[in-house]
Amino acid sequence: MPHPQIVADNAPSLTAVLFGLSGCLVDFGSTAHANTVPAAETLATPGALNILQWLNTQGTPCAWLDELPCAVTTPLAAALPGWVHGCRPATAPWPAPHACWQALMELNIAHLDGCVLVSGEPRLLQSGLNAGLWTIGLASCGSLCGLSPGQWQALDEQAREHKRAKATVALYGLGVHSVIDHLGELGTCLADIGLRRLKGEKP
């Protein structure tokens, strides 16, 4: 049997990774609204900057998507590296696939193979599924739990596990390909998708 690391090294590289903005890269609990941006929510979520840095070293194009107006997304995205592309809202709202396709076109991506969407927002994940992308749902970080980092940490372990499990079931119910807790776990998940692609699996 091949060594897992050898298999992972032979896995095809990623073509592009799309992220939700609010409730994924920033705004842990997806609490920003059309007219309000809580100051704490402009901070990058756990693991976000590290995984973006890693993807950049791999030469993987990345972009974020959101349906909030520019007056909200601009301050939200301020904590992110400048090379991460911010996409204009698509004319067709989620869960239509147009936003994902538009984002890939803005990144000059010519094909869907190896393209991944990461989000904690069910409607955006549905958009990714409809677009033919690999999709990774975030259980604790996003609108399904809807808690700020402080509120999340204030819960006891049993309450956190209950919310996490409920969100995980809901995400798999959408049909997503993988579910992780937060972006700190994304590297391992992307490696797993690489192995699945190596075996011929399609999204």
Model-derived regions: residue spans:
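Asp-based, Mg2+/Mn2+-dependent phosphohydrolase catalytic module
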Residues: 1-31, 37-43, 49, 53-60, ...
